Amino acid sequence: MAAPIILFSFLLFFSVSVSALNVGVQLIHPSISLTKECSRKCESEFCSVPPFLRYGKYCGLLYSGCPGERPCDGLDSCCMKHDACVQSKNNDYLSQECSQKFINCMNNFSQKKQPTFKGNKCDADEVIDVISIVMEAALIAGKVLKKP
């Protein structure tokens, strides 16, 4: 039952202009934005809220490190690799290959109990759980839409 709800939410989310979601968001918290940004600092905010999640420099919706920026830790490196994979697939966020590689990378990070970056306020396993839910929805949507 949860999978269809997540899939519907995922498809609905990607069918709405992201800028439309930004309406009123800054009124609630001025640091929240859904515009494409690049980061030069390691962040850890909104750890359990997928649309606003900011982890490291590369983890988060429409959020990525600036060109040439090194990832903050192993989990952030997984996000950086996912960003690069999606970009190499003409920004196809439903790419089965990119989503599966990302999930595998995060699982590997978690299993090895790698350290997180200094100053991190998020529980890495919670961040992985949140991102994994979104990626599982992307995998389902990609299968439905027959994405490679």
Curated annotation (Swiss-Prot):
pH-linked activity: Optimum pH is 8.5-9.
UniProt cross-references to SUPFAM superfamilies, sorted A to Z: Phospholipase A2, PLA2
Keywords per UniProt: Calcium, Cytoplasmic vesicle, Disulfide bond, Golgi apparatus, Hydrolase, Lipid degradation, Lipid metabolism, Metal-binding, Nucleus, Secreted, Signal
UniProt lineage: Eukaryota, Viridiplantae, Streptophyta, Embryophyta, Tracheophyta
Cofactor requirement: Ca(2+)
Disulphide-bonded residues: 38-66, 42-72, 47-122, 59-79, 78-105, 85-98
Class of the enzyme per the UniProt entry, highest EC level: hydrolase
Designated name of the protein: Phospholipase A2-alpha
Catalytic activity: a 1,2-diacyl-sn-glycero-3-phosphocholine + H2O = a 1-acyl-sn-glycero-3-phosphocholine + a fatty acid + H(+)
Induction details: Induced 6 hours post pathogen infection in the area immediately neighboring the inoculated zone.
Signal peptide: 1-20
Annotated active site: 82
Gene field: PLA2-ALPHA
Effect of mutating residue 99 to A/D: Drastically reduces the activity
Predominant location category: secreted
Binding residues for Ca(2+): 58, 60, 63, 83
Purpose of the protein: PA2 catalyzes the calcium-dependent hydrolysis of the 2-acyl groups in 3-sn-phosphoglycerides. Releases lysophospholipids (LPLs) and free fatty acids (FFAs) from membrane phospholipids in response to hormones and other external stimuli. Modulates the trafficking of PIN proteins to the plasma membrane. Negatively regulates MYB30 transcriptional activity and hypersensitive response control.
GO (cellular component) term, any one: extracellular region
Note: The enzyme has a preference towards linoleoyl acyl chain over palmitoyl acyl chain. It also has a slight preference for phosphatidylethanolamine over phosphatidylcholine.
Family (UniProt): Belongs to the phospholipase A2 family.
Location(s), subcellular: Secreted; Golgi apparatus; Cytoplasmic vesicle; Nucleus
Annotated tissue distribution: Ubiquitous but expressed at a low level.
InterPro entries on file: PLipase_A2 (IPR001211), PLipase_A2_dom_sf (IPR036444), PLipase_A2_His_AS (IPR033113)
UniProt remark on cofactor binding: Binds 1 Ca(2+) ion per subunit.
GO molecular function: calcium ion binding; phospholipase A2 activity
EC number: 3.1.1.4
Thermal activity characteristics from the UniProt entry: Optimum temperature is 30-40 degrees Celsius.
